[in-house]
């Protein structure tokens, strides 16, 4: 007996049918179905395009790393005046 019991869903469905009417709900259902079909078709064609393309080679880094040889120097901090 939660807030979304099956009885509540029946009441919500009746209110929606009264507000929108059965004809508008039928058109909405067919539009949603066509949208889902279009989405699936687009996903399937995109996957087919990926299968047709050869695997990409890993890219080379633009700047090759380089090492600088140097000696560390000791830095003395100035005395604090507290």
From Swiss-Prot:
One GO term of the cellular component aspect? TAT protein transport complex
First-listed, main subcellular location of the protein, grouped into a coarse class: membrane
Per the UniProt record, which residue ranges are transmembrane? 1-21
Q: Name one GO biological process term.
A: protein transport by the Tat complex
- Gene3D superfamilies (UniProt xref): 1.20.5.3310
The topology of this chain with respect to the membrane is: Single-pass membrane protein
Location(s) in or outside the cell: Cell inner membrane
Q: Which residues form a coiled coil?
A: none
User: Which is a Pfam family this sequence falls into?
Assistant: TatA_B_E
Molecular function in Gene Ontology: protein transmembrane transporter activity
Q: Where is this region: Disordered?
A: 43-82
Annotated keywords: Cell inner membrane, Cell membrane, Membrane, Protein transport, Translocation, Transmembrane, Transmembrane helix, Transport
Task: Extract the HAMAP family matched here.
Answer: TatA_E
What does the UniProt record say this protein does? Part of the twin-arginine translocation (Tat) system that transports large folded proteins containing a characteristic twin-arginine motif in their signal peptide across membranes. TatA could form the protein-conducting channel of the Tat system.
Q: Which family does it belong to?
A: Belongs to the TatA/E family.
Describe its assembly.
Answer: The Tat system comprises two distinct complexes: a TatABC complex, containing multiple copies of TatA, TatB and TatC subunits, and a separate TatA complex, containing only TatA subunits. Substrates initially bind to the TatABC complex, which probably triggers association of the separate TatA complex to form the active translocon.
Q: What is this protein called?
A: Sec-independent protein translocase protein TatA
Which taxonomic lineage is given here? Bacteria, Pseudomonadati, Pseudomonadota, Gammaproteobacteria, Pseudomonadales
């Amino acid at each position: 007996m939660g807030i979304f019991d099956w009885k509540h869903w029946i009441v919500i469905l009746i209110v929606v049918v009264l507000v929108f009417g059965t004809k508008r709900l039928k058109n909405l259902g067919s539009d949603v179905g066509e949208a889902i079909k279009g989405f699936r078709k687009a996903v399937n064609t995109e996957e087919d395009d990926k299968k047709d393309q050869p695997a990409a080679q890993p890219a080379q880094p633009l700047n090759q790393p380089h090492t600088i040889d140097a000696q560390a120097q000791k830095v003395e901090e100035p005395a604090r005046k507290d």
